[in-house]
């Protein structure tokens, strides 16, 4: 059976001198793995459209146990990400998060596809700082994947106003000054600007998701919180994250 869809290539693997196995986040079928035959040759008609980070239209043969790409047409390559190793590493980290949070052939992934495409665009075009972009992506993909934290009111007493708050990754939410003593888990004191930013990353309209800024210190605080929450949710160390952080430090 032949099917068509658009999608972003989030991983590629060489399987012979001429063929690749690519992992695609598609609009219609979620994550699929498809064979791309002969595409390692520059003469192949699909060569330019099955590279890592390519957003393409695909015509795919769907068999009982495998997909094979028949035709593809690149809509956006994000090629300039390869010119900056820090941006390249961050883009690979974003793709790794998708692979860890989205099941193969999971349906209704349109918003996740939109998120990664918007994020790669902002990353490639230097629209916002890498640190802030990373935090927005982490919180939004967690929310879309079922890890929506409580950022509205205290997770203990439900107080929502006139309080100082802490974020506790282990309980998936915030607690107030009065209740924080009840928890021995690692916690992050929230300034008003960081709490606003956390809420914005989750609750803002999709087309306004990146339309805010923070001072450098607040960006650092937000980054520490979103990364800690992400690692708590995925419950594993991510080599792509470790590599990105090494680049940022150095």
Task: Describe these PLM feature segments.
Residues 1-250:
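Non-catalytic alpha-helical scaffolds and adjoining flexible linkers that form interface surfaces
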